[in-house]
Amino acid sequence: MISFYELITKIQKRPALYLGKESISNLQVFLDGYTFARRELKVPISNEEEDFEDFQEWIEKKYNLQDTQSWTKIILFYSVDERDALERFFELFDEFVKRNSSTTTEKVKQKSVVGK
């Protein structure tokens, strides 16, 4: 089975195949269905899925918002339309993943220095 982040990368390459049309709202519905299916099948949450749960808070900080709107609605608000919002999501997602990678790398470095 492919990882959660690999799935998002596949969606980015061929959004119409997975979403029907290029739309951030369709992406949200797809991801909600994916999450629901995994829960129904009692598949444990992966590290990437757990990490993605922080995306909402990260988006709020990125746009300097403390809002009750979903990340989907926030990105859509700052976009021209659904298609533009989807493209913007993938840019933000890449930034989110890279930020987390550097944060994780820093934590590992700190642990190795402390352990010496």
Task: Walk through the language-model features, giving the residues of each.
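Short terminal alpha-helical segments
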Residues: 1-36
